[in-house]
């Protein structure tokens, strides 16, 4: 609106008072193209990171365990999962333009390893006659199908009216309940799974999040999830429920090695039957992404996502999955819980997501940081 937005001249140009300018700066986290100060953007991006980090590395932990990989390759898989998620998120936050083609949605969505592919990943990786090279090869070639979906999506969007996308969103929300309850009880690999202290600490996190969201103002409300997680982490650490040994033994710097699997043979193996399976899974993943992008747009921005944003999001993920295949990472997809945070807090700045993505990438090169 006239008088509310600055021009490209002096920073104060377009604002009546310094107070009005500062107020606009403070509201930058609630604008898609808002550029909040780093000290404001970082904790909000870190909040998104915390909401997806465990879910992002669990598929790699499961596959590494089932495939009986040694500690080096297990750590490498986790590193690559963090790198893949960071690159995919960064591409969504800051799309690349190639003429009229847009690679990335430009919407506030957080990317990570998708569980849609987990059953086939476990089956292929644990089969001695197949292994990870077959998995990454099929994943790489099948990602081309997402390119096709991205280009035809504007023409088939009429088959996804609000009633359909609304149903998808509800289904995504319901599916998160079982995952949330499982993690609340202790999560994967916790020997104290289901014990009372897990429920009490989890309950504390929920209470803090709800209280900050309902009664907090400004950053307290916007960072409600981060505050809740930190509160739970501190209580767990004081109670002796946090193991810091993995942090002490982790390296400060390590470069994720591409095409690391193959045992002297090809690191990528292409089998048509598995490529076809992955093509189907990529379509399912695209539908889920449409739902998550709709949640972020409607909940955070108060509007429906544009055709360009949806197709750009699918296309961006296609290229992210190709990158992931080369860097020993499983296919990526949008994380519903992170879109839910956008809808709850209204923090929809792409720069906030960008700081979260850059933190993920930094963690991929610093195992000690990832161990936190």
Segments (PLM) and residue ranges:
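N-terminal signal-anchor module of multipass membrane proteins
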Residues: 2-109, 116-124
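Flexible hinge motifs at transmembrane-helix junctions and intramembrane kinks/re-entrant loops
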Residues: 2-15, 66, 71-78, 193, ...
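Helix-boundary and loop/linker segments of multi-pass membrane transporters
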Residues: 30-37, 262-273, 306-307
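Membrane-embedded helical hairpins/re-entrant loop segments and their flanking transmembrane helices
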Residues: 38, 64-83, 87-104, 277-350
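Alpha-helical transmembrane segments of multi-pass membrane proteins, especially transporters
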Residues: 44-48, 73-85, 104-115, 119, ...
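Generic transmembrane alpha-helix signature in multi-pass membrane proteins
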Residues: 60-66, 118-126, 154, 183-185, ...
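Membrane-helix interface "capping/anchor" motifs
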Residues: 94-107, 154-159, 213-224, 345-350
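Membrane-embedded alpha-helical modules
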Residues: 124-243, 355-372
